Amino acid sequence: MDLKADSEDVDYKQPAPIEDFASRSTLHGISHMFTYERVCIKRTLWILFFLGSVGALALVCVDRVQFYFQYPHVTKLDEVAAPLMTFPAVTFCNLNSFRFSRVTRNDLYHAGELXALLNGRYEIRDTHLVEENVLEILKERANFDNYKPRPFNMREFYDRTGHDIKDMLLSCYYRGVECNAENFKVIFTRYGKCYTFNSGKDGRPLLLTMKGGMGNGLELMLDIQQDEYLPVWGETDETSFEAGIKVQIHTQSEPPFIDQLGFGVAPGFQTFVSCQEQRLTYLPPPWGDCKAAPMDSDFFSTYSITACRIDCETRYLVENCNCRMVHMPGDAPYCTPEQYKECADPALDFLVERDNDYCVCKTPCNLTRFGKEMSFVKIPSKASAKYLAKKFXKTEQYIADNILVLDIYFDALNYETIEQKKAYEVAGLLGDIGGQMGLFIGASILTILELFDYLYEVLKYKLCRCVKKKHKGRGNKDRGAVLSLDDVKRHAPCENLRTPSTYPGNMLPHHPGQGNFEDFTC
């Protein structure tokens, strides 16, 4: 037994020669490149063909990978029939925000300049443009001698002077069933006091429709009350040159943004609006640019572009003007007429028309909108003018100037789906690369594993040989200083006690020769 045993020799299996591996590999062409034959021209041609195929494969794979990271998408359109559909919310506003007959002396004192009725000195503007009967009323109301103004609130002003649905609504039918003012909910927009049909608020169930076509939707006859329009002697954001109403068709979860997205309906016409519901599905980044995260707002729970815009505009005005407009949510104080004129209106106009960076609202990933086709006919006809004038106790001219009819209905009981889909996914990328590998070099994933397995065996063998050589070199150096038990027995030092003798001087390396009894003890 050795005093210090040498490291055991480990028999590492040498991998097969590359010619043997190539002969049984499933990689096409490699058996012709690594062969025991010494035909140089043939091997050279096979190497060139193989390298060319690998190069072509690399180009195609790079192209496919680049295409994948472009994240392309396609749009799928479909029409889906439905047994019944939810009727949309319909919001309308009179283009005139304030009724002239409801404007009081206190209103003129505070908001006369805002509505372009008075100048900064509380005087009537451009009296030569004023009709005589209107001028008399204004002179009476604009007499502020010894007048003590009362507190003024813009929300109350808009609510009190805005057009009343009970006065505007001449007739209302939904699917042939009569409706009334109770079916409309007041909502404030930038046009002031507006009304929404089928809002779903106050616990009211949403209205359904089971047929398409005219007569299966909403039909309104409205009086826009042009006699109540404020006289216009100047241009402000609160005055309007038009007569009629603004209408927006939207979902119940989406607040109206009627000044930007509404369409106009003129008096003297019956307007037919044929709708089709469109359900859009967009992809989030990196394939698309929709917003998948929930709404981060104190005012709205469901994300939509209009909710985002209103939320952003509200925050912008509160930050810059320390107040909010009447149609804006929140608990900040309402702007005064002076703040409307000096700060709120200019700031909001700047935000809407020129600043494209502050209010950037992404499209939601799921969106419902309503496509519209509109047509018009004249109302009243010559044959019906006298009847309508008699029915509503108005003149024929009043009927022609103020009456409009609005029909909104689904053109068919179906909806359109517009869906973005990923055009190229991981499965497609792997399929393309696998197909090209099979075409150019006849390889598969398992072929690649074969190559890696052989390379692993070769590297392991080379590495282990290097480690073994280092261990052998270190063992040879240490062996010169170690005396094994066999060496001791071979020289039998205890027997030499009876026969005096001496050991060679080099018996114990690195030590000087010594006497018999000093060398070992038996």
Swiss-Prot record:
The chain crosses the membrane at residues 50-66, 426-456. One of its GO terms (cellular component) is plasma membrane. The record marks D355 as: Involved in proton-dependent gating. One of its GO terms (molecular function) is pH-gated monoatomic ion channel activity. It comes from the Eukaryota. It is found in: Cell membrane; Postsynaptic cell membrane; Cell projection, Dendrite. Glycans are attached at N366. External calcium is required to potentiate proton activation of ASIC1 at physiological concentrations, but at higher, non-physiological concentrations, it inhibits activation. Inhibited by the diuretic drug amiloride. GO terms for biological process: cellular response to pH; sodium ion transmembrane transport. Residues 67-425 are extracellular. It catalyses: Na(+)(in) = Na(+)(out); Li(+)(in) = Li(+)(out); K(+)(in) = K(+)(out); Ca(2+)(in) = Ca(2+)(out). A motif (GAS motif) lies at residues 442-444. Disulfide bonds join C93-C194, C172-C179, C290-C365, C308-C361, C312-C359, C321-C343, C323-C335. Gene3D superfamilies: acid-sensing ion channel 1 domain, Acid-sensing ion channel domain, YojJ-like. The second transmembrane domain (TM2) is a discontinuous alpha-helix disrupted by the GAS motif, which forms the selectivity filter by adopting an extended, belt-like conformation aligned approximately parallel to the membrane plane. This peptide belt encircles the waist of the channel and divides TM2 into two discontinuous helical segments. The distal helical segment of TM2 interacts with the cytoplasmic portion of the first transmembrane domain (TM1) from a neighboring subunit, contributing to the structural and functional integrity of the channel. Homotrimer. Heterotrimer; with other ASIC proteins producing channel with different properties. Forms voltage-independent, pH-gated trimeric sodium channels that act as postsynaptic excitatory receptors in the nervous system, playing a crucial role in regulating synaptic plasticity, learning, and memory. Upon extracellular pH drop this channel elicits transient, fast activating, and completely desensitizing inward currents. Displays high selectivity for sodium ions but can also permit the permeation of other cations. This is Acid-sensing ion channel 1. It comes from Opsanus tau (Oyster toadfish). The gene is asic1.
